[in-house]
Amino acid sequence: MKCVEVYKELYHQEPFGIAFCPYRISPLGAHIDHQYGKINGLAIDKGIHMAYHPKQNGVVELQSLNFPKRAQFFVSAVPEEKQGDWADHLRGAAKMLGEKYRLKVGLSGIIEGSLPIGGLSSSASVIICFLSALCKVNGIHLEPMEMILTAKAAENQYVGVSCGKLDQSCEVLSKKNHLLYLDTKDDSYELIPTSEKMKPYKVAIFFSGLERSLKNSKYNLRQDECKAAAYALMGYAGMDYDTFANTRLRDVPVEVFEACLLYTSDAAD
């Protein structure tokens, strides 16, 4: 890990800890999780590593090997407004964790991603990796679902991405040689083991040459479009429905979908 090498060169000591969060792949889940659908996915052996040590003065100082500009802030006084850089994910994580727990200890170190940014949930991985280290130095233990929801809140409420919980769930709950099956409405999940009858396999991941960030994409617009569709379908069916913000495609019965598909098909003819 290059982050460990750089850490030793910079601080002239072994790191106090090395945090890791894997990237994820998802055969089924894009724009399904934020509509409270059922998804599946698995973690891979690539991800975010961070070599770090605690800082008793409560300051976070992190250098990324993937982005310019060092992150620096007090864990007890996170800026209310995002700054528009990669460290917003760290600030958001600290702010959400700090709303539930008293944070006194900061940390300093080096963070790196092992693959190009975008497409493998790198933003969620950064948040969870940082949260793991921040919890460690502050003596905080988060249960898996609490870690997932804290990381999700950091993206939703601070970074400004209206994501669901697909990425965080795959990264926290996945197990080697298993497929995660998750119902994002009630958070029930199952880890499905690889069948003994299944032939050995590998997952190929291709880099398109383009790097992206959800906060700079039309991701939030896509979610609003899904909500608008659900709102219209429920109104068409004469169903009782909640506010626009609390409407999801999961709330629409299958028979309503099928009836509307039949209607649109007839109209097209």
Task: Name each region found by the language model.
Residues L97, E155, A230-M234, A268:
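Generic helix-packing signal
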Residues Y263-D269:
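Conserved small/polar residues in nucleotide/adenosyl-binding loops
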Residues S125-I127:
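FabD-like malonyl-/acyl-CoA
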Residues S162-L262:
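Acidic-enriched catalytic cores of C-N bond-cleaving enzymes acting on peptides and small amides
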Residues M1-S121, L131-M145, L149-V159, C163, ...:
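ATP-binding N-lobe of GHMP and related small-molecule kinases
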Residues S122, L166, A268:
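Single, functionally critical "micro-switch" positions that shape active/binding sites
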Residues H89, C129, E225, T264:
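Charged catalytic carboxylate motif
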